[in-house]
Amino acid sequence: MRSAEAPSDDSQPPQSLRALIGVIGAGIFVTGFGWPGIIGRLPFSLLLKNQLHMSADRVAVFWAIATLAWYVKPLAGFICDAYPLFGTRRRGYMLAGSALAGLFWLTFAVVPRGYASLVAVMTVLNIAMVFVSTVVGGLQVEVSQRYGATGRLASLRTGLEGVMNLLAGPVGGWLAVRAFGWTALSGSLVMLSFIPVVAWLDREPRGAPVNRQRASEVWSIARSHLGTIVRSRSMWGATGLLFLVYLAPGFQTPMLYYQQDVLKFDPRFMGFLQTLGGVGSIVGAALYGALCRKVPLRTSLIAGILLNAGSTLFYLRYESATSAALIDGAAGLVGTLATLPLYDLAARATPPGVESFGFSLMMSIRNVAIFVISDPLGSYLYSRHHVGFKQLVWLNAGSSAAVLLFLPVLPRALLAGREQSRAAG
């Protein structure tokens, strides 16, 4: 609800669609590529492993704690909606969040190389980035609805994610063999580059009021959305399936130790392997885009769960540079085909009227499964109980395949039909 003192948005000249798409595209890129888990995954993990001499489970716990803000991303959305910053609902958060994120990135260059100090700085960095990411996502939804640009913006996000995956490997590998200050500077420059884009292209008018009535309305909507979600059997069924699929003991961090300590891979080659996985993911996404119009979701889910378990078994032959390159590329392709049906299910299961909040809530629960449970559990078994890398592969594959037992819980109507048939209906 607009207050009487606030200027009407209708009196302002409409913003250019091209300019808004520029802001959205830049925002997606900087909050993705500039996230420490992308550009800084190798440099940070190898710093903790080789300089601070930490075990795999402590490295996994580091990432679990430091990415805490991403688990409660829906909360950031409600805060942004309820409390404008510098008289705007978007622009202020994007500018302030990017500036703070750039500053926190630079702090890594001077902060003492200790576990607690690194966790503290990365935690506040992630908080700043979550607010930027949340506002950019809200802007994407708003522009999609206002201009009928859902397809273009969805394609933009997918394309940029592909570019990020391709760049993250070689850039992360290059940074991992240089002084850590280069990583801090690189992350800072990525985040700070968003400031001139927002300042130049986003012409959101000032005057959004901070009033208790608006905040009360936003939190009332939040309670209503939560009530709708709690009553949705489809929503909780899909959320449970997502959680269980990603709950299997993971080996992301143990694989880094295995690559360095057993296979003696150079960090730059490890970055190259990430790039191959990114290429496979892009190809897999393109293939699923065609298959989802021809194959019912139930079939895709069953095949996806089996593919997820099967592609994991590729890593049993992860024994040389050549096999690693082939396996990472193939696993990226097959793994994407395996997981995209889960996101299709998540989108279908979200109750009408709470699409953005419901979907982000499911993704937050997925993140908890990956970062708080799966990777730390696998790393704990690897470090403390001396479970070998290949034993972890078997454990992960078996746990993933067992999720098939959960499928009968999902409503039949949710799994019926292809994407095209649902759209037609």
Predicted features by range, described:
Residues P7-W70, W236-L241, V245-L263, M270:
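Helix-loop boundary and gating motifs at the non-cytosolic
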Residues R298-L342:
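C-terminal transmembrane helical hairpin of 12-TM major facilitator-type secondary transporters
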Residues S3-R18, E204-G237:
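Juxtamembrane intracellular "pre-TM" segments in multi-pass secondary transporters
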Residues W70-K73, G151-G173, M363-D375:
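Glycine-rich segments within core transmembrane alpha-helices of 12-TM secondary carriers
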Residues Y71-T88, A176, V283-L297, Y382:
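Helix-to-loop junctions at the C-terminal end of transmembrane segments
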Residues R89-G92, W174-V190, S379-A401:
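A membrane-interface helix-boundary motif in multi-pass transporters
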Residues L95-R113, L306-E319:
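C-terminal ends and interior cores of transmembrane alpha-helices
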Residues F108-A109, L192-D202, L392-G425:
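Multi-pass alpha-helical transporter architecture, strongest
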